Amino acid sequence: MKGFKIPEATISRLSVYSRYLENLYRKGITTVSSADIAQGVGVTSAQVRKDLAYFGEFGTRGVGYNVKELLDHTLKILGLNNTWNMVVVGAGNLGSALCAYRGFRERGFYIVGVFDNDLTKIGKKINEYEVLPIDKLEEVVRENNVEIGIIAVPAAYAQDVATRLVKAGVKGILNFAPTVLNVPDKVIVRSVDLTVNLEVLTFNIRRD
Ligand SMILES: NC(=O)c1ccc[n+]([C@@H]2O[C@H](COP(=O)([O-])OP(=O)(O)OC[C@H]3O[C@@H](n4cnc5c(N)ncnc54)[C@H](O)[C@@H]3O)[C@@H](O)[C@H]2O)c1
């Protein structure tokens, strides 16, 4: 798998396939064809086969894929065969919504700390999480082996928070602030900019 570049779109689809397979597994379905997966997630079966081919040989011609085996493979490829500890910085509207989202835990992502620098928020509870002072960030990251930091502060403060997260030892940052972050190459940043997504949507609506 190392040595050549796997398209990001393939990785995103792998995550979608994996969730689909998880559903089949829960329903007790044991085999599935690429056509079934394709129909279930809304892509072509050629695309499914091409995506999976990046990661080796799966399935048996004429029989299809063993659901459990393919699910385990996709989870392993996505790094989801173990759980991940995360911290959320910014306990505002978005940070609170992220803390309330159950879906993270179902996929093995555990929030172990929520931080803010607003004294009126520190000590308050968001679901089961008590908002912690930002000064505790490094300690919580270290003690809980946190590898992922989520930035949910206004753009003007995002770089400071990113620098602190990196110094504390996180390996990846999910950044919701609409700004570009400067981090060392070894740290992976994924930015979620909802406005950019909306604008891609409006571009495509107009173009069609
Ligand atoms: N709310 C949304 O739907 C939404 C959607 C997409 C992106 N975003 C982005 O997410 C970020 C947060 O948005 P929001 O609506 O939750 O804002 P918000 O103002 O409700 O919350 C931001 C929180 O960050 C805290 N904060 C500020 N500086 C900090 C620092 N240095 N350390 C720790 N905490 C700090 C504030 O006290 C506040 O509680 C923004 O960058 C915003 O552009 C928000």
From Swiss-Prot:
Residue numbers binding NAD(+): G90, A91, G92, N93, L94, G95
Gene Ontology cellular component annotations, sorted alphabetically: cytoplasm
GO biological process, alphabetically ordered: negative regulation of DNA-templated transcription; response to redox state
Main location: cytoplasm
Family matches, as InterPro entries: CoA-bd, NAD(P)-bd_dom_sf, Rex_DNA-bd_C_dom, Tscrpt_rep_Rex, WH-like_DNA-bd_sf, WH_DNA-bd_sf
Keyword Calcium: no
Gene Ontology terms, MF aspect: DNA binding; DNA-binding transcription factor activity
Keyword Transcription regulation listed: yes
Disulfide-linked positions: none
Family assignment from sequence similarity: Belongs to the transcriptional regulatory Rex family.
Quaternary structure and interacting proteins, as annotated: Homodimer.
Protein name as it appears in the record: Redox-sensing transcriptional repressor Rex
